[in-house]
Amino acid sequence: MSVWGAWKPNTPVGYKELKSSEIIDTQIMDEALKRRTTIVLCLLSAFPRDICRDILRRTSSHIVGLGRSRYARRRRALQIGRCERCYRVYPPVCGSKCDNKTCRPGLSINTNVANYIDHGVTEVIPWISPHRGQFYLRPK
């Protein structure tokens, strides 16, 4: 042990043991933590810490591959004949507020349709809430 309380290897074998333990710890980390660590290490070499913190805060809630892209939303909405912005029937049957460009969701939307368009159909794959940053199952 050093004066500061942290162990420092002083032989090549010690360095090898330290490196192997770091590799094992990295393999045990979950996918989100690996992703955050990679982002931090890449950004710290190019930007100041406060900018890295802002970038990390904005990128941590979205994981690629869960079908939350705009293209996936449009594809699912078109599949069930709804507008991807306001969840109303599109093309409108009669006088509707939906023009598929500037429309907004109404006061009472069909939550099942909104969940399907936003997150997909499966209920067993967990997704990350942008507000909590935690995994939980999609509601019906």
Curated annotation (Swiss-Prot):
Nucleotide-binding listed as a keyword: no
GO MF annotation list: DNA binding; zinc ion binding
Zinc finger (C4-type): 83-98, 83-103
Listed name of the protein: RNA silencing suppressor
Family: Belongs to the carlaviruses nucleic acid-binding protein family.
Pfam family, one: Carla_C4
GO BP terms in the entry: regulation of DNA-templated transcription; symbiont-mediated suppression of host innate immune response
Keyword set, alphabetical order: DNA-binding, Host-virus interaction, Inhibition of host innate immune response by virus, Metal-binding, Suppressor of RNA silencing, Viral immunoevasion, Zinc, Zinc-finger
Region annotation (Basic) ranges: 73-76
InterPro entries: Carla-bd (IPR002568)
Task of the protein: Suppressor of viral-induced RNA silencing. The potential mechanism of action is based on sequestering siRNAs.
